[in-house]
C-alpha cells in the first residue's frame, strides 16, 4: 500500500489517516475469501457508500452546470458518467488497477482488467475518502479526476459521428474504416489522444480528446464536416 499512498500524495494531495481503511477499499471479495482465517475486510460496504456520495456530487454538479436541462437529460448524462465502463476508466487513469488485491483465481482470469472490479474499487475509494476526510475532499478529488472529462464533452456526444460516417461511406457497399492513435500526451491521469480515421488506408480526418473514444468521435466528425468527396 505504500506505493498507492505515494501516488495519492503526489498526484492528488491525499494522505489517509486510517491506512487500514484505504487497504480495505482496494481489497476485492475474492482476496478476502481466500484469506478467511485472517478475517480480512473487503470493499463492498465502502463501494455502497462511495456510490451514494458519487451520485450526490455528480448530481449537484450537473444541476448547477446545466440550469436549463430538463430532469430527464440530467439523469441520462449522470448515468453515462457513473456507469461501470466510465468508472473503470477513471480508476485506470488514477493507476488504481495496479493496487487492487485479488484472489489468485480472479487474478488469473483477468480480474485486474475487468471493468466491474475497477469501477467498484473506484467507488470504494470514494467511500473510504469520505470516512477518512470529508465530503469536501471527495468533491475535490472528483473535480480533479472526473469533471475535466465531463466538461470536455466525453459523456455528451450529441451525434454519434462514427456511426454517421460509417453509414455515409457504406451506402454503396462495405469499405474498410479504421481508427488509429497518432500520439498520446500528458500524464497518465490526464492524457490527451490524437486519432486519425482511415478509409481504405487513406487518412480522411483527425481528432483530439481526453480518451480514445472521444478522439475517435472527433476524427469522424472532422471527416464528415469535410464532406464525402475528401473521403474517396
Swiss-Prot record:
It is found in: Cytoplasm. Residues 160-229 form the DRBM domain. Its main location: cytoplasm. Mg(2+) binds at residues 47, 120, 123. CDD domains: DSRM_RNAse_III_family, RIBOc. Its EC number is 3.1.26.3. Keywords: Cytoplasm, Endonuclease, Hydrolase, Magnesium, Metal-binding, mRNA processing, Nuclease, RNA-binding, rRNA processing, rRNA-binding, tRNA processing. Pfam families: dsrm, Ribonucleas_3_3. The keyword Lyase does not apply. The active site is at 51, 123. Homodimer. NCBIfam families: RNaseIII. This is Ribonuclease 3.
